[in-house]
């Protein structure tokens, strides 16, 4: 079937994948998401090593199906799901991708202050941060925030209550705990990021501002005064064999 390379998870950020590589992950859902982020569209076959312990929503195959899955993928006969990624790009040229979600806000349990620009409108805000979710991640952190908002409002339904499709050309941003004051507003706290409507954030924090993806707080970009970050759909997409 060709050559193979065994790779430890910690080596992912620096490994150079070839354009025709097929990547096999053996582990839990988090490994799948983390692997997709470091690829350029190469197909991923996700194996559940212990179906008795793990549900594996992102793990469609078991160990015994590996050879068949790889053979079909090589032959171009496998079904595949496309996954839209989020991209954060700063005005000094730094970039970070997200498979599930991005967080922009304070490093610790303090308030973030920034200027938010979206869809032709702008507003200075103070909040505990902004979550930007992909369809892939819309049943995770985003779902939790939405459930809390619905509970407070007394509403039982919302069109995004069950998330949205992995392949949709959109992201969804949510402002956490926005604080209204004489100088900060709360009118732009929820919206869709599309190709036509990116989200721009300009930091007004002297220190402790961060941008990180997929819950990995140790791998972050600084978001302090002078930093402007644009959140948009990434050109790169993930490909998960199903």
Locations of the language-model features?
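Catalytic phosphate-donor-binding core of small-molecule kinases
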Residues: 1-11, 52-130, 139-242
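N-terminal glycine-/serine-/threonine-rich phosphate-binding loop
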Residues: 1-42, 76, 121
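Conserved residues at the C-terminal ends of beta-strands
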Residues: 26, 47, 105
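Short glycine-rich anion-binding loops that position phosphate/pyrophosphate groups of nucleotides
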Residues: 28-31, 50, 135-139
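Short, acidic/small-residue loops that bind anionic groups at enzyme active sites
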Residues: 35, 39-60
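Short conserved micro-motifs on helix faces and helix-strand junctions that flank
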Residues: 45, 132-134, 212
């Amino acid at each position: 079937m060709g050559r193979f390379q065994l790779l430890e998870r910690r080596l992912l950020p620096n490994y150079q994948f070839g354009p025709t590589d097929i990547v096999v992950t053996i582990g839990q859902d988090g490994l799948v998401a983390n692997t997709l982020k470091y690829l350029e569209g190469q197909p991923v076959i996700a194996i559940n090593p212990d179906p008795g312990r793990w549900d594996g929503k992102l793990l469609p195959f078991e160990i015994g199906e590996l050879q068949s899955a790889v053979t079909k993928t090589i032959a171009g006969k496998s079904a595949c799901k496309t996954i839209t990624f989020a991209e954060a790009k700063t005005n000094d040229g730094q970039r970070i991708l997200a498979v599930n979600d991005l967080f922009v806000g304070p490093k610790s349990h303090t308030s973030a202050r920034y200027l938010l620009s979206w869809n032709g409108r702008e507003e200075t805000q103070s909040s505990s941060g902004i979550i930007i979710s992909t369809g892939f991640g819309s049943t995770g952190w985003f779902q939790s925030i939405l459930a809390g908002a619905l509970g407070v409002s007394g509403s039982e339904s919302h069109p995004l209550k069950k998330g949205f499709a992995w392949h949709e050309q959109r992201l969804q941003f949510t402002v956490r705990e926005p604080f209204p004051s004489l100088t900060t507003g709360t009118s732009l706290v929820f919206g869709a990021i599309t190709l036509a409507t990116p989200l721009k954030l300009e930091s007004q924090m002297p220190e402790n501002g961060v941008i990180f993806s997929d819950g990995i707080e140790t791998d972050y970009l600084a978001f302090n005064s002078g930093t402007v970050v644009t959140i948009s759909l990434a050109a790169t997409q993930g490909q998960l064999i199903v």
